[in-house]
């Protein structure tokens, strides 16, 4: 089959105008949001998976076109870039989404939409010349949407009588002249009225901006997947080890506190606890005031009596040897006083084993 010929797919009935070009866009195919689509749109592989691997698929140079034209069967005529058809202020690769019902059948509502359409139509032929045959079928689908004189003008290309010219800039210029003719869409205007006036400066897609934003969001997601960028959930995943590390630090701190509490010697606490207990109970306070010299060593004999061997207790608390001998002498002195005051030395022996609690006297 010649390079310019393409078989007609479906009946030769004007489906929509050229303004409904987005019906053939892969985004429209993805969410099925476009009414009035009467065929399965084709998908260009370079749109979804850029061959160059870059986010912006740049036009191939004339040398690349000439080398790739050998596989296509003919050398294309050199032409300039289509930058004149598309304003430089607008992004090159963000495809404009035609929404059905917005300015149908004409480009008169905003002239730059026609330039955008022509630039996109030319990009199918110029971005990657190795996809020339696939782009021809796509261009034929776009041309089939033209009505009136535009459809009659595109009929030879659709029938395959005329091949699509390699000089695609000339083709776009001819198409622009046909589309700008006010009589080009007479058949379409007879059926559907244009929702916007011809001289309106408002963009025909203004009511459809939320839909366009959704398409742009999906386009950015597709670019992120193609480029292999890391998902946004990575910062949250990186934050989880930090939380677990803080938990481990807090657990280790608690464990160290428990160790320090267990390792602290017992005799350090009694000087604090007896003062509080003695202040609450008036019984032990009187002998302490009457005998100031014996008030300090009074808790020591009770501890030594509760722990029967006196040599085992001083080892962790007091490693020195002379202190156990002093406590034994004081024990003998205090036992006589306690027998006189309390009268029941056995109850003193049966006091709680905790080093900080003083003996409870039943008389008081």
Swiss-Prot record:
Taxonomic lineage per UniProt? Eukaryota, Metazoa, Chordata, Craniata, Vertebrata
Q: What is the effect of changing residue 122 to A?
A: No effect on interaction with VDAC1
Organism listed in the record: Homo sapiens (Human)
Q: Where is this motif: BH3?
A: 114-128
GO CC terms: mitochondrion
- Residue ranges, annotated region (Disordered): 66-88, 258-364
Protein's UniProt name = Protein Bop
Task: Give the UniProt keywords, A-Z.
Answer: Apoptosis, Mitochondrion
Which domain of life does the UniProt lineage start with?
Answer: Eukaryota
Q: Which gene encodes it?
A: RTL10
């Amino acid at each position: 089959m010649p390079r310019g010929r393409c078989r007609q797919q479906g009946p030769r009935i004007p489906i929509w105008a050229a303004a409904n070009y987005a019906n053939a866009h892969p985004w429209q195919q993805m969410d099925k949001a476009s009414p009035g689509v009467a065929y399965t749109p084709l998908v260009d592989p370079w749109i979804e998976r850029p061959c160059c691997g870059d986010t912006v698929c740049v036009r191939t140079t004339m040398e690349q076109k000439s080398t790739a034209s050998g596989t296509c069967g003919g050398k294309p005529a050199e032409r300039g870039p289509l930058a004149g058809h598309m304003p430089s202020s607008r992004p090159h690769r963000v495809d404009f989404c035609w929404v059905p019902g917005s300015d149908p059948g004409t480009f008169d509502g905003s002239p730059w939409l026609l330039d955008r359409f022509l630039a996109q139509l030319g990009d199918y032929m110029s971005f990657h010349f190795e996809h020339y045959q696939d782009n021809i079928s796509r261009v034929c689908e776009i041309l089939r949407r033209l009505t009136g004189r535009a459809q009659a003008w595109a009929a030879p290309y659709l029938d395959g009588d005329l091949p699509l010219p390699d000089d695609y800039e000339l083709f776009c210029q001819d198409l622009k002249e046909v589309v700008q003719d006010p009589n080009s869409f007479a058949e379409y205007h007879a059926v559907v009225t244009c929702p916007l006036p011809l001289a309106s400066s408002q963009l025909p897609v203004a009511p459809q901006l939320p839909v366009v934003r959704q398409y742009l969001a999906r386009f950015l997601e597709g670019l992120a997947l193609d480029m292999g960028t890391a998902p946004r959930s990575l910062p949250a995943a990186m934050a989880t080890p930090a939380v677990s590390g803080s938990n481990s630090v807090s657990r280790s701190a608690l464990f160290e506190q428990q160790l320090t509490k267990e390792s602290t010697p017992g005799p350090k606490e009694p000087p604090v606890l007896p003062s509080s207990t003695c202040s609450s109970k008036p019984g032990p306070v009187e002998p302490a005031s009457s005998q100031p010299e014996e008030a300090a060593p009074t808790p020591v004999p009770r501890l030594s009596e509760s722990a029967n061997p006196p040599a085992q207790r001083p080892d962790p608390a007091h490693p020195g040897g002379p202190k156990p001998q002093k406590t034994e002498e004081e024990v003998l002195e205090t036992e006589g006083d306690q027998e006189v005051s309390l009268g029941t030395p056995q109850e003193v022996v049966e006091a709680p084993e905790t080093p900080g609690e003083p003996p409870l006297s039943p008389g008081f």
